[in-house]
């Protein structure tokens, strides 16, 4: 003979009713259909409860947050959790018989106007939308402000760079113009004769000097400038002309001051020989041929 769902078979083969456990307790193992004769009562595990006597198992407590409702009482081993009203922006549907669902659903635009809780929440949302600016608009305004600041900074740096280059260019142009004007002024004050543009180096040779008396200096061309500096005063040979191809003995008219300057420029070391080759007197002019050594330039 088979045992019922609440019976177990004892050692003599008879069907015996399973042990009953009180509230907050359950059997340690399933009992029924001839099995579970050694089961005993234990306390319900956490998050489970049992409110009546019986051999059945403890039931799982309800979670109010899962069904979008406010929890009013916690779950115990003898009682289930108690849930209250729906959370904000949620409502419970009403069935045809007047009963309401246990679970609350979100409010939408299609929610009937009879649901007072959804009507109140939608009005609050509209007021918030008018008072609080959207996050996207704030982000766009911030990005736009940063772009404007970066653009102004870039334009300022570019302007300073261009101004620096322009000032440098103007300074270079003024310097070149000043150098050119200075060169033109020097050329106008000290013109270079065509035959004296280059001055090659000369070896030690014999020079020819021509000395004039002081009474004829007034009519001389070398002293006709009345103290103004001439090109001859800047030459190392002191009135001696420079030859293009070779040293040529040519009479040159010089003053006593030129002779003194030339004599002081000759080095004192070494023997100096003065030999009078020819002395010619032609009127008031005396020509002397004097051998001398010219220092290399």
From Swiss-Prot:
TNFR-Cys repeats lie at residues 2-41, 43-83, 85-118. GO terms for molecular function: transmembrane signaling receptor activity; tumor necrosis factor receptor activity. It is a single-pass type III membrane protein. GO terms for cellular component: plasma membrane. One of its GO terms (biological process) is positive regulation of JNK cascade. It holds the Pfam family TNFR_c6. The chain crosses the membrane at residues 139-159. Keywords: Developmental protein, Differentiation, Disulfide bond, Glycoprotein, Membrane, Receptor, Repeat, Transmembrane, Transmembrane helix. InterPro entries: TNFR/NGFR_Cys_rich_reg, TNFR_27, TNFRSF27_N, TNR19/27/EDAR. Glycans are attached at residues 74, 77. Disulfide bonds join 3-15, 18-31, 21-41, 44-58, 61-75, 64-83, 86-104, 107-118. PROSITE patterns: TNFR_NGFR_1, TNFR_NGFR_2. It is found in: Membrane. Residues 160-297 are cytoplasmic. Residues 1-138 are extracellular. Associates with TRAF1, TRAF3 and TRAF6. Receptor for EDA isoform A2, but not for EDA isoform A1. Mediates the activation of the NF-kappa-B and JNK pathways. Activation seems to be mediated by binding to TRAF3 and TRAF6. This is Tumor necrosis factor receptor superfamily member 27. It comes from Mus musculus.
């Amino acid at each position: 003979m088979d045992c019922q769902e609440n019976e177990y078979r004892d050692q003599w083969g008879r069907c015996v009713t399973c042990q009953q456990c009180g509230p907050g307790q359950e059997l340690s193992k399933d009992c029924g259909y001839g099995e579970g004769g050694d089961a005993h009562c234990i306390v319900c595990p956490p998050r489970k409860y049992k409110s009546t006597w019986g051999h059945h198992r403890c039931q799982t407590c309800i979670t109010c947050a899962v069904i979008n409702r406010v929890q009013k009482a916690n779950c115990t081993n003898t009682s289930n959790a108690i849930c209250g009203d729906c959370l904000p922006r949620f409502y419970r549907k009403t069935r045809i018989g007047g009963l309401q669902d246990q679970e609350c659903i979100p409010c939408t635009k299609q929610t009937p106007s009879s649901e007072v809780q959804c009507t109140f929440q939608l009005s609050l949302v509209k007021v918030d939308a008018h008072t609080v600016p959207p996050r996207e608009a704030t982000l766009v305004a911030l990005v736009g402000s940063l772009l404007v600041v970066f653009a102004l900074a870039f334009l300022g740096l570019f302007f300073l760079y261009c101004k620096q280059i322009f000032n440098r260019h103007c300074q270079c142009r003024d310097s070149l113009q000043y150098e050119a004007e200075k060169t033109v002024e020097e050329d106008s004050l000290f013109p270079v004769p065509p035959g004296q543009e280059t001055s090659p180096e000369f070896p030690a040779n014999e020079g020819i000097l021509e000395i004039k008396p002081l009474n004829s200096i007034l009519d001389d061309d070398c002293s006709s400038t009345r103290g103004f500096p001439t090109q001859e005063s800047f030459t190392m040979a002191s009135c001696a002309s420079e030859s293009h191809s070779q040293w040529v003995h040519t009479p040159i008219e010089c003053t006593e001051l030129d002779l003194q300057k030339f004599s002081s420029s000759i080095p004192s070391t070494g023997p100096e020989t003065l030999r009078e080759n020819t002395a010619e007197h032609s009127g008031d002019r005396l020509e002397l041929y004097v051998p001398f050594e010219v220092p290399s330039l």
